[in-house]
Amino acid sequence: MDKIWRELGLTDEEYEKIISILGREPNITEIGMYSVMWSEHCAYKNSKPLLKYLPTKGERVIQGPGENAGVLDIGDNLAVVMKIESHNHPSAIEPYQGAATGVGGIIRDIFTMGARPIALLDSLRFGIPDDKRTKYLIENVVAGIADYGNCIGIPTVGGDTYFEESYKGNPLVNAMCVGIVEKDKIKKGIAKGIGNPVMIVGATTGRDGIGGASFASQELSEESEEKRPSVQVGDPFMEKLLLEACLELFETDAVVAIQDMGAAGLTSSSCEMASRGGVGMELDLDKVPLREKGMTPYEIMLSESQERMLVVVEKGKEEDVQKVFKKWGLNAATIGKITDDGMIRVIKEGKIVAEVPAKSLAEDAPQYIREEEVPKWQEDVNKLNINEVKPPEDMNKALKDVISSLNIASKEWIYSQYDYMVRTDTAITPGMDAAVVRIKGTKKAIALTTDCNGRYCYLDPYIGSQIAVAEAARNLCMVGAKPIGVTDCLNFGNPEKKEIYWQLKNSIFGIAKACETLQIPVVSGNVSLYNENEEGAIYPTPVIGMAGLIEDVSKICTMDFKKERDVIIILGENKGEIGGSEYLKVCFGMVKGQPPQIDLEEEKRLQELVLKLIDKGLINSSHDISEGGFAAALVESAISGKKGAKISLQTSLREDIELFSESPPRALITVSPEKVEEVLKIAYEYQVPAQKVGVVEGKKIAIEVNGKKIIDLPLEVLEESWRGRIKWEMERN
């Protein structure tokens, strides 16, 4: 056992701490249990001291961070349950199963709370698809998500995808799930009732995924390929049965507490439930249904076999549970009981093979406040002399290049593989500002989005993270939804490196600032660190998943142009910023400058204005202006509405900057001619600049700036560039 704890990811100091907790040397099973529970993946030991700065309270918050998922009150005795999680490391090694089990795990987090899952979203980051390995990762991640979601029958309605060099070999796969539950039927993972039986339900336990949580807490290296057994294998049909069986079980009064077995399997579900309830748990491993012979206590406690749950049952109700699971063709075995001594006691063949305090596993992991410093390259990348960037001679070509860039081009190649209409409640489908899902039996709907521009966060993690929150909220407002809650997935490199810790800290402070100002609480989330390989770290990528409430689904708005002669209006001010922009990268190969500055009070006014205009039925389309600036937003609205636009801009800015600056907060709206004056009047009341810039007409995009015609392109030419790019990249050799 020479220094085995080091191989499992524990430091010598952490090992000494375990000895002092137990008053003795731990055995191999106990070391394994601590190694997964004290891993970054389970314990958040590098991020917990920072996460406390996030605002988590609000009038709608029923359950904030600390449970399997966050819960928000949406009225009518209903609540929305939401959570996002990463499956980055497994997806880098075994992309199909890594992505599929990421989806499976997040779905379980939702129905564990008693909710029926109604929607999935995926936030994906890949390298540039110009080599075989990257294409292999993209194809298989997308297929894994599609197959799992499609088979289980939950629509994948939205998400976001970016391609940047920093994600090469280090893809990010963040899966978000949302469910609906009646408020009085919410379930929690708090074990109680001394003597109550503990049951394992669902699939059998095998050797897949052993040590997966520890694996997810390391940098990727050449050896990572050998860790394929650390990637779990998912079975969506089994999960569908488990989902229905659990929801049926919740209609009985048999369940005291329930938790899914995700990272760290039986170890985490037992110690977290026991710790929350201040009780202990005795587990007899001879009673666990196994799929492989000769499994050791270490393997059984650390297995991450999918589609399993741990349930604390009211004493005497075991048969009720078995009856439900038998009906669905699933296992339900009593493997232990609740005790009063706070210990997790593991028994095999009549002998105690592990005995540790539940609280020490779940709550006593050391927390680290790391040293930080501004990266040495930061000052250099933030310098941008605009005079070095010569305006392009051919603005038509510049526009085509920007809208066909990988980050702006249509993501149809990806989302067309997903079934986004299953359950028939999807009111706004992928490709718009936000997805919208109707809530059966009500007039309400939930709008959903995920957002984060990692390039902005690389240039300034504090500002970039504020923009991520602001853009997510703005996207929801564009469809007529009031933002109500955030679930965040913080993807960063190795926090033991001072410059990465600096990024993490500033990013969290940025999210906190934006959420406080916009009054949107963070109710759940996930942290994924050590996202780096031999090439270096990923861009800091704090993905913001956000939900918004629409009281009346008949009032939703979309970004597509609706009617010829509608007047096109820009809300908000263009401050002429091109640092970190798509234009700068695509047309000049530069990732430099400061990201656009954001005034959150201005953002708040713009969002409230758009919600007001949509509620009063004054606008026909609305689209946020972000990557690619006004020009990209205009083309997107035109393509999706199959109608052109004639634009005339007056500006003191350079032509290219006027078109491609990404200054927030801005929006592009269209208004019937007879309603224009009223819209401008209300915008003035909200102190939001509003400028008439043109009309919807014809089948081309024509733009003049200060009286000079600079863009004149048929819509079909633009559409071909925009729609075909990703498919073309994936199919060329």
Swiss-Prot record:
What does the record give as its pathway?
Purine metabolism; IMP biosynthesis via de novo pathway; 5-amino-1-(5-phospho-D-ribosyl)imidazole from N(2)-formyl-N(1)-(5-phospho-D-ribosyl)glycinamide: step 1/2
The record's listing under InterPro entries reads: PRibForGlyAmidine_synth_PurL (IPR010074), PurL_linker (IPR041609), PurM-like_C_dom (IPR010918), PurM-like_C_sf (IPR036676), PurM-like_N (IPR016188), PurM-like_N_sf (IPR036921)
Q: Which UniProt keywords apply?
A: ATP-binding, Cytoplasm, Ligase, Magnesium, Metal-binding, Nucleotide-binding, Purine biosynthesis
Q: Which residues bind Mg(2+) 2?
A: D109, D260
Question: Which GO cellular component terms, listed alphabetically, does the Swiss-Prot or TrEMBL entry include?
Answer: cytoplasm
Q: Which residues bind ATP?
A: Y44, K83, D488, G525
Catalysed reaction(s)?
N(2)-formyl-N(1)-(5-phospho-beta-D-ribosyl)glycinamide + L-glutamine + ATP + H2O = 2-formamido-N(1)-(5-O-phospho-beta-D-ribosyl)acetamidine + L-glutamate + ADP + phosphate + H(+)
The cross-references to PANTHER family, in alphabetical order and at most eight, read: PHOSPHORIBOSYLFORMYLGLYCINAMIDINE SYNTHASE SUBUNIT PURL (PTHR43555:SF1)
Q: What protein is this chain from?
A: Phosphoribosylformylglycinamidine synthase subunit PurL
Query: Which organism's genome codes for this protein?
Result: Thermoanaerobacter pseudethanolicus (strain ATCC 33223 / 39E)
